[in-house]
Curated annotation (Swiss-Prot):
Biological process terms in GO annotation: riboflavin biosynthetic process
Name of the protein in question: 6,7-dimethyl-8-ribityllumazine synthase
Pathway: Cofactor biosynthesis; riboflavin biosynthesis; riboflavin from 2-hydroxy-3-oxobutyl phosphate and 5-amino-6-(D-ribitylamino)uracil: step 1/2
EC number of this enzyme: 2.5.1.78
Catalytic activity: (2S)-2-hydroxy-3-oxobutyl phosphate + 5-amino-6-(D-ribitylamino)uracil = 6,7-dimethyl-8-(1-D-ribityl)lumazine + phosphate + 2 H2O + H(+)
Transmembrane stretches, start-end: none
CDD domains: Lumazine_synthase-I (cd09209)
Amino acid sequence: MKLIEGQLKVVNGKKVAIVSTRWNHFIVDRLVEGAKDAFARHGGDEADLTHVLVPGAFELPMIIDKLLASGKYDAICALGAVIRGATPHFDYVSAEATKGIAMMSLKHQKPVSFGLLTTDNIEQSIERAGTKAGNKGFEAMTVVIEMLDLYENL
């Protein structure tokens, strides 16, 4: 049986956009730094990387759609943090942002990684932004890199 899988090596010339949220920036800024670090460590050229900042998680799918529809980007690394509060707002924003991000990958047939933290409290977000649980921004960018390579090999 033949196995096809992506490798963690940047595909030269592929344009990647990091789309991140301004809301909860004290967490998201760490995710963005992790994503940029992953891109650089795997041989990415900074000229092939663009950072787009949106107000919050609900806006991620719309901007991802516009970026991919432009034809200028080969993949998107979506980053943000939605932290549960006392109202059901968390549930609505998390669910719709998650569905919207997934739909953009399917609609455009391009890799869109999911680096949107959905946590119960600030401590969980901090853990996932570079402490106990690693940096989910770094992980989200490695997904982009692997998926771009996989697409090249299909």
